[in-house]
Amino acid sequence: IKVIHKCTSARHSLKAQSIGCDAVSVDGFECGGHPGEDDIPNFILLPRAADELEIPFVASGGMADARSLVAAMALGAEGMNMGTRFIATQDAPVHQNVKEAIVGASELDTRLIMRSLTNTERVMNNDAVERLMEKEKALGDQLTFADIVDEVAGVYPKIMHEGTMDAGAWSCGMVAGLVNDIPTVKELIDTIMDEADAIISKRLSNF
């Protein structure tokens, strides 16, 4: 069994290496879900990981296409990991409403929630997220998980399976702004590899 540990900082990546992980997924601030508490984007985080690590790592957060792959490898990663982009594929076992929400979103449509709980999550903005943020604003440091349980607990089946998009907060990366279609996984991967080869052999051939 190979273990790839998600890490959101260079220091966490080093810890994963020290306890025997085979590789790490280095997640920048752009990522959907939990980006950690350091707010370091991948243009800084990936080279930092490359400077520190001896084990291989893949880049996560903001990854969507051939440009992402080539850039990630230039910054030291062995490849890239995609979350939000893969959700918006025909093969993803989620409701069509979720896929269309990602395609219809821009890079401005995510929000960071639960920062005061030191459990920061990047989510797609919707009515439930707006309610949650109003609670955060009103309660400040007094906010507890119990105050927002209706917006975050048990909501994924309603969203991902039933397509009730305002049922609660759901993870989505800023990369939604780069997602414009819903291909099959094979089509997506084939396109990424073909376009990455073209970038390297043509656009970058003179460097």
Task: Report residues per predicted region.
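Active-site glycine- and acidic-residue-rich loops that bind
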Residues: I1-T8, L132
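Glycine/Thr-rich beta-alpha phosphate-binding loop at enzyme active sites
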Residues: K6-L46, T89, P93-H95
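Conserved active-site-proximal phosphate/metal-binding subdomains
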Residues: G36-V58, M63-F207
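Glycine-enriched alpha-helix->loop->beta-strand junction motifs that scaffold or abut catalytic
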Residues: I1-V3, S18-S25, F29, E52-I55, ...
